[in-house]
């Protein structure tokens, strides 16, 4: 059962019903329910589904891709030598499919782009020379490494420039959606309790899924965050590591803003965090904003 996400589901259904091939990008911070959203929307049924391997090298990624092709009915094939060959096999699978719309779901795609793999060039070629030339392919890519999605796909200046037809940022739940989620799990909580939970966990569905019925707010928080074996004890560092390459400066920005409490101007942030006034800093701030960690408020006067 999906709580909220009405707009995202509507757009995915619209892409599926389109008379043309469509390219959808689903992205957002870790634990926010991106994969669950896509799988639930399509009832866990895809022409091809694959997920990148965390910290796997190119050979590991290609072997996993081969295995996903086999799971999709490709039959026994050798491990591709490179990504061009891998996507050539995917083209064969799509040609063989009798489905009206061929839904291709590639999850955790940033992990597949290993050094010197030419992965982005291969997926550019797959889309531009094959999928977009047909009318029956829905390509959905998904990832938590938002900076990769933004810079390598959404702001691509090469073969993927302006190719994405559906851009779906998945944001944390609102307070109302968190209340609906708690009701769906039959966990009773007063409005005050909900507010306390929201101040601790934000609107991240995975965190709320760990709450135990019958425990108080303090008991749940202590068990999940402060206990030695707490499931969220090390979540802070793991979260930034999963989202950003070289996350230290991202963490510094968020920590400085958190300590200030009332917000900071860009110039204040640059000075306080020891950043350089350049495009790299702009990209970091944009990445954090896209992930929902910070919010830019224009000043007037």
What are these model-predicted stretches?
Residues 1-301:
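Phosphate-binding site recognition
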């Amino acid at each position: 059962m999906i709580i909220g996400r009405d707009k995202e589901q509507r757009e995915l259904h619209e892409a599926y019903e389109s008379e043309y091939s469509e390219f959808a990008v689903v992205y957002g911070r870790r634990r926010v329910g991106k994969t669950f959203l896509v799988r639930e929307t399509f009832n866990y049924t895809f022409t091809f589904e694959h997920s990148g391997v965390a910290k796997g090298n190119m050979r590991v990624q290609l072997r996993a891709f081969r295995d996903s092709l086999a799971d999709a009915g490709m039959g026994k094939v050798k491990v591709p030598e490179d990504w061009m060959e891998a996507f050539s096999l995917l083209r064969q699978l799509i040609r063989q499919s009798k489905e009206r719309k061929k839904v291709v779901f590639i999850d955790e795609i940033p992990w597949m782009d290993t050094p010197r793999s030419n992965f982005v060039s291969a997926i550019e070629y797959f889309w531009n020379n094959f999928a977009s030339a047909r009318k029956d392919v829905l390509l959905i890519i998904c990832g938590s490494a938002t900076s990769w999605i933004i810079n390598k796909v959404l702001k691509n200046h090469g073969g993927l420039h302006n190719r994405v037809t559906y851009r779906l940022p998945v944001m944390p739940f609102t307070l109302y959606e968190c209340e609906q989620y708690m009701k769906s799990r039959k966990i009773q909580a007063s409005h005050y309790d909900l507010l306390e939970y929201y101040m601790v966990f934000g609107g991240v569905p995975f965190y709320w899924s760990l709450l135990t019925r019958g425990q108080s707010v303090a008991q749940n928080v202590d068990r999940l965050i402060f206990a030695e074996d707490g499931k969220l004890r090390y979540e802070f560092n793991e979260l930034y590591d999963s989202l950003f390459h070289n996350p230290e400066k991202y963490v510094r920005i968020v920590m400085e803003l958190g300590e200030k409490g009332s917000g900071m101007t860009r110039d204040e942030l640059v000075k306080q965090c020891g950043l350089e006034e350049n495009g790299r800093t702009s990209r970091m701030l944009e990445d954090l904003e896209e992930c929902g960690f910070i919010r830019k408020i224009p000043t007037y006067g």
